[in-house]
Amino acid sequence: MSDYQVLLYYKYTTIDDPETFAKEHLAACKEMELKGRILVATEGINGTVSGTVEATNKYMDYMANDARFADMVFKIDAADAHAFKKMHVRPRAEIVSLSLEEDVNPLEVTGTYLEPSEFREALLDEDTVILDARNDYEFDIGHFRGAVRPDIQNFRELPGWIEDNREQLADKKIVTYCTGGIRCEKFSGWLKTAGFDDVSQLHGGIATYGKNEETKGELWDGQMYVFDERIAVPINQVNPTIVGKDYFDGTPCERYINCANPYCNKQILASIENEKKYLRSCSHDCRVHPANLYTKNLSKEEFTERLQAIDETLPEMVQ
């Protein structure tokens, strides 16, 4: 049995003073020796925390004693250690940011909830568009079979992508999904206000679908990206597959790294061998960038040799 747990949760509810709440909540979390990342806004709370089984159970009891969060659903993953290095609770304008001119309140408008078994039926329906509401790098390591991959690197870019592709989506039955459900609550609501009539969402997100005894994560390919030290977790208990591809050679890969140029920091899938071969950099410009955190530890001679091995050279100004 694992000694630790990771809790994923959210709740759209009114928090009158997010700054005071965040300060007090941080103190409570630290007292319970939790680590994680929690966002608080007037519209609610969005968090992921890790801790011992005892500590996380205590936290869930603590939240249940607050009427605002009494019915909040926690997605629970077993873990061998903390999934975060520190504990942060931050006040924000939104708990998920779509940066709309007129914000959408999921308590007033949101897509129809589909339970896991209903969502699986939608996956098999040729007349339904399954729309991934996550970022492109999340999709690339794992997604539902046949889902549409929006070309976005941030959630707030999604409405713009929808508008650019409105013709293909018009009059379609749309079902959207995300990690734990929070993004879809707001996004599906926005879709309805934007003129899309038949909009549904996976209730509880991918995390719930993967743990459902009936679906067991079936029709999910790859792993689910998570925003903590684990990076990705398995979902499909029936016939798991690898869909991630190495950025450099296209071979199957589920290992994410960040480009060593801090001004880029792009997330790419790469094997240990290719990380070394390509100096943990996504492009030539990033490899030779003066701020590169990987190459700064190499001598000029070694740097030159490593570049020559991949048919590249140092810029003249550096030579």
Swiss-Prot record:
Using the record's annotation, list all stretches that form the Rhodanese domain.
Answer: 124-218
Q: What does this protein do?
A: Catalyzes oxygen-dependent 5-hydroxyuridine (ho5U) modification at position 34 in tRNAs.
Q: Which reaction does it catalyse?
A: uridine(34) in tRNA + AH2 + O2 = 5-hydroxyuridine(34) in tRNA + A + H2O
| Upper taxonomic lineage | Bacteria, Bacillati, Bacillota, Bacilli, Bacillales
Keyword set, alphabetical order: Oxidoreductase, tRNA processing
Q: Which family does it belong to?
A: Belongs to the TrhO family.
Q: Mind listing the GO molecular function terms for this protein?
A: oxidoreductase activity, acting on paired donors, with incorporation or reduction of molecular oxygen
CDD domains in UniProt: RHOD_YceA
Designated name of the protein: tRNA uridine(34) hydroxylase
Reply yes or no: does the keyword Cytoplasm apply. no
Q: What is an example of a Pfam family matching this protein? A: Rhodanese_C
The residues that cross the membrane are: none
Tell me a GO biological process for this protein: tRNA modification
Q: What is its EC number?
A: 1.14.-.-
According to its UniProt record, which residues of this chain constitute the active site?
Answer: 178
**What Gene3D superfamilies does the record point to?**
3.30.70.100, Rhodanese-like domain (3.40.250.10)
* tRNA processing recorded as keyword: yes
